[in-house]
């Protein structure tokens, strides 16, 4: 029996729902329970408190900034039962909270998510909020979000640059269905356009001022060692060959044909940055310092991509 299974048996045996009455009771108890468990935090939240807060308030249809003075409000029996069922799922099946609530936050915006897409967590969010300064010479009018998934990066870019149009590309029709939900939720039907394509294969020869790419980049070794929570995400959105760079190299090779002369590619490769640096020591990757933490995001100009293109064949 695993440690989490022991916790679940204790929850059932103690008939917790009879002793917990208020929002505050459930927050404290859930926080303690998560702290005692061996669940992994890394899908939008990095600690037990934030996960407990998100799970409970979202499930109760309450805002995350719900006033503390109302935390003493009592819950109905049915609300308690729903919360306990979700908490047990989090412990037993190691399902990320975002999939349990179907809600995730990115750049201060709320997105619908389910297991057809990975949970939004890209450190590129910091660059979006800063308007990609100082990487861009001017505000972009045309943006391409490659490997869009839930559409969070595309929509956040459209919010940050009100005059821009954004193409949101993904190979997965399932992912694009989720992106469409979010495009409609954020009233972006006339500015964010979902496109099914194997990278650039089915795109018109448009030119973009900015290409943002968050492709699969987990290498084979890391993929096999990932915590159970990651196995609920679509594998095609995580792994990318032995070195994690199979898809990134294709993007690097094709991107200059789709960028304006002043255009910039911003791409996330996470821990696979080590392999990228080793394989291409002569390429002047601009590894961006991210104010919210995180590593593995680089920028290259159209001219740089064209100059070193022969290396990515």
Swiss-Prot record:
One of its GO terms (cellular component) is cytosol. It comes from Pasteurella multocida (strain Pm70). It is an enzyme of class 2 (transferase). GO terms for molecular function: nucleic acid binding; protein-glutamine N-methyltransferase activity. This is Ribosomal protein uL3 glutamine methyltransferase. The gene is prmB. One of its GO terms (biological process) is methylation. Its EC number is 2.1.1.298. Pfam families: MTS. Keywords: Methyltransferase, S-adenosyl-L-methionine, Transferase. HAMAP family: L3_methyltr_PrmB. Methylates large ribosomal subunit protein uL3 on a specific glutamine residue. It catalyses: L-glutaminyl-[ribosomal protein uL3] + S-adenosyl-L-methionine = N(5)-methyl-L-glutaminyl-[ribosomal protein uL3] + S-adenosyl-L-homocysteine + H(+). Belongs to the protein N5-glutamine methyltransferase family. PrmB subfamily.
